[in-house]
Regions:
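A short, exposed helix-loop element centered on a Lys and neighboring polar residues
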Residues: 1, 45
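Active-site loop immediately N-terminal to the catalytic Tyr-X3-Lys motif
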Residues: 25-31, 53-54, 90, 95, ...
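Residue(s) in the substrate-gating loop at a strand-loop-helix junction
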Residues: 20
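Short, small/polar-rich loop/turn modules that mediate ligand/substrate recognition or access, typified
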Residues: 12, 52, 57, 113-115
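Short, flexible catalytic-loop segment of classical short-chain dehydrogenase/reductase
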Residues: 24, 62-73
């Protein structure tokens, strides 16, 4: 709500929420986390409908396995095994790859995209669809 007055004054207002692939297909390891991220997905869709008439786009990125502080404690061998078995690209992503997708949703080329839920997951959800 605090940002809305500023977004309304912007030439190309964008909101990009970050959820997780856990919101799209829970692994059963952490139900509260999956539920919270699913809430972000629902909020994104509701905001897209509510703010669309004002020209504000709202989209959501759902990172999959990415090398972050959250995944740092996982042994490297375990990460590699998981990625080979579960992702089409057979690797963990880098934070920069998520950042680049976030930036791309703020470019003029994305001006007609709103309410989208975009997995940035190396093909994890494609294999689980």
């Amino acid at each position: 709500r605090t940002a809305l007055p500023h977004l309304r004054k912007s030439k190309s207002p964008r909101i990009v929420n970050i959820a997780s692939t856990e919101a799209l297909g829970a692994t059963g390891r952490d139900s509260p986390y999956a539920a919270a991220k699913a809430g972000v997905v629902g909020l994104t869709r509701a905001m897209a409908v509510d703010l669309g008439p004002e020209g504000i786009t709202v989209n959501c990125i759902c990172p999959g396995p990415v090398r972050t502080g959250m995944t740092a404690p996982i042994p490297e061998d375990d990460k590699n095994t998981y990625a080979r078995r579960r992702t089409a690209l057979r690797r963990y992503g880098d934070p920069e790859e998520v950042a680049h997708m976030t930036l791309s949703l703020c470019l003029p080329a994305a001006s007609f995209l709103t309410g989208a839920i975009i997995p940035v997951d190396g093909g994890l959800m494609a294999r689980n669809a």
